[in-house]
Amino acid sequence: MEPTVADVHLVPRTTKEVPALDAACCRAASIGVVATSLVVLTLGVLLAFLSTQGFHVDHTAELRGIRWTSSLRRETSDYHRTLTPTLEALLHFLLRPLQTLSLGLEEELLQRGIRARLREHGISLAAYGTIVSAELTGRHKGPLAERDFKSGRCPGNSFSCGNSQCVTKVNPECDDQEDCSDGSDEAHCECGLQPAWRMAGRIVGGMEASPGEFPWQASLRENKEHFCGAAIINARWLVSAAHCFNEFQDPTKWVAYVGATYLSGSEASTVRAQVVQIVKHPLYNADTADFDVAVLELTSPLPFGRHIQPVCLPAATHIFPPSKKCLISGWGYLKEDFLVKPEVLQKATVELLDQALCASLYGHSLTDRMVCAGYLDGKVDSCQGDSGGPLVCEEPSGRFFLAGIVSWGIGCAEARRPGVYARVTRLRDWILEATTKASMPLAPTMAPAPAAPSTAWPTSPESPVVSTPTKSMQALSTVPLDWVTVPKLQECGARPAMEKPTRVVGGFGAASGEVPWQVSLKEGSRHFCGATVVGDRWLLSAAHCFNHTKVEQVRAHLGTASLLGLGGSPVKIGLRRVVLHPLYNPGILDFDLAVLELASPLAFNKYIQPVCLPLAIQKFPVGRKCMISGWGNTQEGNATKPELLQKASVGIIDQKTCSVLYNFSLTDRMICAGFLEGKVDSCQGDSGGPLACEEAPGVFYLAGIVSWGIGCAQVKKPGVYTRITRLKGWILEIMSSQPLPMSPPSTTRMLATTSPRTTAGLTVPGATPSRPTPGAASRVTGQPANSTLSAVSTTARGQTPFPDAPEATTHTQLPDCGLAPAALTRIVGGSAAGRGEWPWQVSLWLRRREHRCGAVLVAERWLLSAAHCFDVYGDPKQWAAFLGTPFLSGAEGQLERVARIYKHPFYNLYTLDYDVALLELAGPVRRSRLVRPICLPEPAPRPPDGTRCVITGWGSVREGGSMARQLQKAAVRLLSEQTCRRFYPVQISSRMLCAGFPQGGVDSCSGDAGGPLACREPSGRWVLTGVTSWGYGCGRPHFPGVYTRVAAVRGWIGQHIQE
């Protein structure tokens, strides 16, 4: 498909000259604010789609570098006649045709196009100066047929009337006063009223709502269970949070209850409406919860009445000032630790918070599409089950406007952790656009549909299903993953053929097995791009490699450093499909990534190994030396490919520095590497190859994919790579989705919102509460987990052994629990455990092939483990439990099937808060001296700081090492919460505790996740104090292990098991 042209016209408007800082009051054909050396003009943008759908976008832009004169007011003046055609002629840029173009994407592409045109030398207007920059400052959008191409645009926060009159009054819409001469500010105001509500007293929070008090409130049900909230915006459309539909995407599975106050929907006013279409915002980011909005189309119009009314959508210029009291409503949980939904709709008053203040509370992870509400001291908040519900603010007219949509937060009503809501004023244009174009959705409809085998954007793409830790209730993943194999830690990023990995300095030939994840993509015998092994069926490459490629003719060559296939263990294999990132932009090579599925799985050996995928929060610091490799040109202009794989060492370059070097604002999906003096770089033919960084001795993580650059190895022109951390979620989503039923190989663009699923249990320490910290090592063994997914020995070197205790006594809570009847040896650190020494220890095996996580027996048919163990593999049929054996092989153990997996509903994939899961076994275990449960703690204060407890597991016995063949035990010391927060300042919640030693040396490690932190009481009973969760590396000084505090989730556990 040929790209279409977006014609950008900057058309000067006559205007009255005003002071530089004053707002301009504009009439029908006037626009502009005048300041010294600054001209503010309207950009009219005509986007001509091949589908013949046209949109006209008026933007206000600040043009800098040219002088303003009064002659610009006259269309007949020389200045006016010089400026207009110059801009019309010069400001053109190409857009790849999209299925639809959202407002957010339109504005971003427009700004990039303008900057690209002005990048070199600006646009000279002779005597009037040179335009050096054009920054967008405002917009209005509507169908081309409805809006005159030359219409004006109001500046700043001025309200734009239907006749282009500008109104500077604050929030003039629907205030029962006509401010526009055409009355458009009071049109469409049958909204936000409470006709059934007569007692609008002041709401203080935590109260039951009366019937008809929130007539716009909807309950979204999946399988007859309330899952999320929503708000009515017109008779056929609801608005909710996009993350509500990560797990369940088929609109036919959803039913909306409106007009209801009771969760049962028993009132006569309740209407049950079937959902026919779900449209997520195309820029929704499940990693950050940015653009967290979706609209739902109903099968038939709603009957408006006293109990069913729409809420008012605010204008984009509507101001909701900080400290304004607003209302939230929903059927979410009443308390964070009381997981029962109320029968009656709840309401509460919250206060809008200053954006900068909220950003400081959440580590500056807020975007302009978010708004915070609540109180600094907590106590009032939305909670799980409220997601998608409304945050409404009453204006003097008595109408309620939708200020926000319940999105996310840390915990519920915690101090200094207010609720975060999607800001509707920033999203209302897209909402209106999506709901007025029901016949051509702007984002993927969630009805399942296989992606078409075409290189064009599919008309009904399937949206991948993942779970995201926000305020919606977590549901178990039902995506079967039997056919996916993602490498475990010790199987990824290693180079078994290299006994002593030498330091890469650049420009050398590589030996077979030195870069075992390197792939050559060939059409026939022609090498055209590189690729990288990330799984037994999966490769990553650059999307631009497949612009003009027939997938069925492509073969992947790997297992050898020779382009001719000599030496090593060469393998040639076809491709099943190629999935390009849905936001791939060939113009600027943004989102330049493709996932390649192989026709058959690889057999890993010392010449073929996957590289480790980093976590979304992993950092590759500036200056870090990483390795690039490929068979690309060895010098610029020389098209001869080397016969031997080339490798070179490059340094990570600061993003801002790189943007300056390229005079182009690099996106977050790009990362630069090389040297300012040039000399070392990737080149033509290397595209799609790896930029791999050695994060632990001999363990490499994929930081980037070779994408683009100017020339090769030129001075101050480093290579630009696709940043994997930003796209990790999408990669895993494709790898975790069902294979599409395609006979021929295909290239697909999957338009979908995705959320990263770690392949090995996420790890957290991070800079913000919503994301884990770089270097946080997940304790799961299996897939790559984080930047320093290395493991430290559970050896306690020279530590005081755990003191012997008197004989255990019977406990009324759980008969026989917490007793260790077999001989209890003294713990000296890092020693092997004997049979029956820790009878509650369980080994969880994935597909009965390998140990993946630990678990703890807490009742006859219940195990407790870490929720992050099941992020990727959530199907209980894939898991088996071995009990009663200290041997990693499972020898002499009791094998039990897992029937169900229940993650804690508050589990947060990114912060690892509430990192706990219950596993229900298919049948009760056979108790013996080798198999018995541990005691659960009472919901009482934690053991005293400094208490010595025991950790056990089969995890790595040293950072970066292999698994222990026999169960290991070590003594650790409980650290105070204050000490823990000193080591991990941001990410420690009240559901976490730290254990270890400040000097390091003793810790749990990769493969220990889900295992027990057990403390012995004076009575002799062993009590489960913590569940192994995460940490930075293993056994490092000042980075103790972090455990889920079991007492904090004791109530939830008790709801599931009967003791």
Swiss-Prot record:
Highest taxon, organism lineage: Eukaryota
EC number: 3.4.21.-
Modification after translation: Proteolytically cleaved to generate 3 independent serine protease chains. The cleaved chains may remain attached to the membrane thanks to disulfide bonds. It is unclear whether cleavage always takes place.
GO BP, sorted A to Z: proteolysis
InterPro entries the UniProt entry points to: LDL_receptor-like_sf, LDrepeatLR_classA_rpt, Peptidase_S1_PA, Peptidase_S1_PA_chymotrypsin, Peptidase_S1A, Tmprss9, Trypsin_dom, TRYPSIN_HIS
Entry annotation: catalytic residues: 243 (charge relay system), 292 (charge relay system), 387 (charge relay system), 544 (charge relay system), 592 (charge relay system), 687 (charge relay system)
Name of the protein: Transmembrane protease serine 9
